[in-house]
Regions:
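Short, surface-exposed recognition loops and adjoining beta-strand edges that mediate ligand/DNA contacts
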Residues: 179-195, 273-288, 330-419
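Compositionally biased P/S/T/G-rich terminal and signal peptide-adjacent segments
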Residues: 39-82, 136-139
Length: 605
C-alpha cells in the first residue's frame, strides 16, 4: 500500500498537522493489522476517477499489473492518497516514486514492507504488499486539480457544469462499482465464503466490521454530494455563461444533480442509521434516531452534526426527487453517453421515488410511482432465456428494446472504472482461472428456488472440483475481463414488487391486485405462482430476484426481520442477528468522529 500525503508547506507543530500525521499512522497501523484480508475494505477508485479529481496525477504511471485500488481522505488543505496494490512489481514502485520526485514532491518519511505468504489446498499465492506512509511537500504546479480550482472558474460556463455533472456520475461508481451491493448480500445470508477463497469477504458474513472499516460508502457518497452541491450552487446562482443554452437544458442538468445527491443520501441513511419505520413506530429519539449530516454547502471547515432519519428523508431526499421530477423533460437523455440507462431520466427519478416512498412507508405514493414507471412502456419483464441473456450482454439494455434495466452504473476499462463483483462471484476455474470464487450462493438461498426457476438454472453454476456448491453468473465481465460489469441499481421487477407490497399494505391502483404483481415476477422466472400475498412471500421473492444486487439487507431492516442462517460456519456469535439490534446501523467512520466533535457515533461501537 502506498500512502501519500499532498499538502501545502506547513509547520508540523500546529495541531492540525499533528492530527494529519497521527491519522496517517493510525490508518497505516489499521491496514497492517487487517492485512489478513489483503485489502482495506474501503472505497475502490479507478485511476481515471482520481486523475479527474487531482489532475497533476495524470502524468503518473497507471498500474496495469494486477489489481489496484485507490482511496483518499481530504483534511483541510491536504489530501491523503492511499493506493493498495496487489501483486506489486518493483519496476512500478520505482517508476511511481521517480515521477513523484520529478514532479517536485519531497519525501519526508520512511518505507515499511510487509510480506504475506498464504497457502490453500489448490495453489500457493505469494503476495508482496508494499506499505508506505510517506509525506510530501507540495510545490505549486501549473496544472491544478479541477476540483481544487476556483469554483467560479471551473463552473463559469454551462459546459463546465455539464462536465462536473458527468464527474458526479463517476463518483457513484465508487460505491456501486465496488463491493457495496455484494457486502450486504453476504452479511444477510444470500452469499457465503466459498470453499476456495483469497481471504476477501470473510469479515462481512460474520458482521465483523469496525468504525475504521466502513469508510468506503461514507467517503464516496459525500464526495458525490460535494460535487452535486457545487454544480447546484452554480446553477442556482446563475453566474455561468449561458451562450444560448435553454432553460430546459439547465433544468435537466439540475435534475440530474438533485437525483444523484438524493441517491447518495438515501444510501447513506439506509446504511448508517436504523430504519425509518422502526424509529417512527417506537417513538425513538436521541442518537438512535440519528441519520447522517445534511451538507448543502462546500465548506471543508464545517463540522456538521447528524440530522435525524426523518429529516434526511423529509428535508432532503424526498424534496430533491420531487424537484428533479418536476424539472426534467419527459424525453431527456444525456447526450453522448455510451449507455443510455446509466444516466438519469424521468422514469429513473420516478423509480427511485417509488423505492424511497416504500422505505418512508408512504404506501400510496410508492404504488403511484411504481405504476408511473410500469406504464411508461420503456421497460418490461423478460421471460426465461431472455432474462438470463440480459446478464451476458446479448440482450440490448437500451430502453427502446424493452429492457428490464431502468438505471445502472456503467463500468468500463476505457475510463478507468471497475467493478469487484465479477472477480469475487465467479467460480474458480472460470474465465481462464480468473474467478476468485470468494463468494458462493448460500444453500439457504438455493433452497428457496423452485427447480425450474431460471434464476437458479440459468444464473448459478456448479463447479466439478467443488461439488455441492453454486456460484452466481450474473456478472461475467466484458470482453473476458471479470473486473468490468455494469451494475443494475433499479429494475422493472422491483417496481412490481413495490406496488404489490404497497397494495397489500392498503394502497389502491385501479385494475391491479397485489397477488397479480407478485406472480407476474415469479411466473416470468418460471417459478410457481404464489397462492397468497404476505410480507414473507414478498421478501422471499425479492431475495431470489435481486441476488447480489444489494437489496436483502435493506429489505430486512425496513421489514424489521431478524437474520436466521443455517449455511454458516464462521463466528457462532454472529450466525443469527436479531432485530432490533445496534448492528443494523453500521458505525460512522472513525475519521469523522475524530475530526468532528459534533459527530455522534452510533450506539454499540
Amino acid at each position: 500500500m502506498i500512502g501519500v500525503r499532498f499538502s501545502e508547506n506547513k509547520c508540523c507543530r500546529n495541531s492540525q498537522c499533528k492530527k494529519v500525521l497521527w491519522l496517517s499512522m493510525l490508518l497505516l497501523t489499521s491496514f497492517i493489522i487487517g492485512c489478513e484480508d489483503q485489502e482495506r475494505n474501503n472505497v475502490t477508485w479507478g485511476w481515471g476517477s482520481l486523475v479527474e479529481r487531482y489532475s497533476f496525477l495524470s502524468d503518473f504511471p497507471a498500474y496495469d499489473g494486477g489489481i489496484a485500488k485507490y482511496d483518499y481522505q481530504e483534511v483541510e488543505d491536504s489530501v491523503l492518497l492511499y493506493v493498495v496494490l496487489d501483486y506489486v512489481d518493483k519496476p512500478f514502485v520505482v517508476a511511481y516514486f521517480k515521477k513523484l520526485e520529478d514532479s517536485g514532491f519531497e519525501m519526508k518519511s520512511d518505507l515499511r514492507i510487509y510480506k504475506k505468504y498464504k497457502e490453500n489446498q489448490n495453489y500457493k499465492l505469494i503476495v508482496e504488499v508494499d506499505i508506505m506512509s510517506i509525506t510530501f511537500k507540495k510545490i505549486p504546479l501549473t496544472k491544478e486539480p479541477p476540483m481544487d480550482q476556483s469554483d467560479e472558474l471551473a463552473l463559469s460556463t454551462f459546459e463546465g457544469i455539464d462536465g462536473a455533472t458527468a464527474g458526479n456520475y463517476r463518483a457513484v461508481i465508487s460505491w456501486y462499482g465496488a463491493s457495496f451491493p455484494l457486502t450486504f448480500d453476504v452479511m444477510c445470508g444470500n452469499g457465503m465464503v466459498g470453499p476456495v477463497n483469497t481471504g476477501r469477504m470473510r469479515m462481512e458474513p460474520a458482521w465483523n466490521y469496525t468504525s475504521t472499516s466502513t469508510m468506503g460508502l461514507w467517503s464516496s457518497a459525500y464526495s458525490a454530494i460535494l460535487g452535486c452541491n457545487k454544480a447546484l450552487t452554480a446553477i442556482n446562482e446563475g453566474k455561468f455563461s449561458r451562450n444560448g443554452v435553454s432553460d430546459e437544458q439547465i433544468n435537466n442538468i439540475k435534475a440530474e444533480n438533485l437525483f444523484l445527491r438524493a441517491l447518495a443520501y438515501f444510501d447513506l441513511v439506509r446504511v448508517y442509521a436504523q430504519p425509518y419505520g422502526y424509529i417512527k413506530a417506537n417513538g425513538i429519539t436521541g442518537v438512535e434516531a440519528m441519520g447522517v449530516p445534511i451538507v448543502l454547502k462546500d465548506d471543508l471547515s464545517a463540522r456538521p452534526s447528524r440530522n435525524t432519519v426523518a429529516e434526511v428523508y423529509e428535508n432532503l431526499i424526498i424534496p430533491d426527487l420531487v424537484e428533479a421530477e418536476r424539472l426534467m423533460s419527459d424525453s431527456y437523455v444525456r447526450v453522448g453517453v455510451k449507455d443510455v440507462v446509466a444516466t438519469v431520466t424521468k422514469p429513473v427519478i420516478q423509480a427511485l421515488m417509488a423505492r424511497v416512498y416504500l422505505h418512508h412507508e408512504d404506501w400510496q405514493l410508492a404504488a403511484d410511482y411504481a405504476t408511473k414507471v410500469i406504464k411508461n412502456g420503456r421497460f418490461r419483464l423478460l421471460s426465461g432465456d431472455r432474462f438470463v441473456s440480459m446478464w451476458d450482454g446479448s440482450v440490448d439494455v437500451a430502453p427502446q428494446s424493452g429492457s428490464e434495466i431502468i438505471f445502472e452504473v456503467y463500468v468500463s476499462q476505457s475510463d478507468g472504472s471497475r467493478s469487484d463483483l465479477g472477480d469475487h462471484l465467479t467460480a474458480p476455474e472460470v474465465a481462464g482461472g480468473a474467478g476468485y470464487g470468494d463468494v458462493r450462493v448460500s444453500n439457504d438461498l438455493i433452497d428457496l428456488y423452485d427447480a425450474t426457476d431460471v434464476r437458479l438454472t440459468g444464473l448459478t453454476k456448479t463447479n466439478s472440483k467443488y461439488p455441492g456448491y453454486r456460484w452466481s453468473t450474473k456478472f461475467p465481465g466484458k470482453n473476458g475481463l471479470l473486473a468490468y460489469n455494469n451494475v443494475p441499481v433499479l429494475r422493472i421487477s422491483e417496481m412490481y414488487l413495490i406496488r404489490s407490497e404497497a397494495i397489500y399494505r392498503g394502497a389502491t391502483v385501479s385494475g391491479v391486485t397485489a397477488i397479480d404483481d407478485l406472480n407476474r415476477v415469479a411466473t416470468n422466472r418460471n417459478a410457481e405462482a404464489y397462492a397468497t400475498v404476505t410480507l414473507d412471500n414478498l421478501f422471499e421473492e425479492s431475495r431470489k430476484e435481486f441476488l447480489f444486487e444489494g437489496h436483502v439487507f435493506f429489505d430486512m431492516k425496513r421489514l424489521q426481520k431478524s437474520l436466521v442462517r443455517t449455511d454458516y460456519d464462521l463466528d457462532p456469535l454472529t450466525k443469527n442477528i436479531d432485530f432490533p439490534s445496534y448492528r443494523w446501523a453500521l458505525p460512522i467512520p472513525e475519521n469523522d468522529i475524530l475530526y468532528n466533535d459534533n459527530m455522534d457515533q452510533n450506539p454499540g461501537y
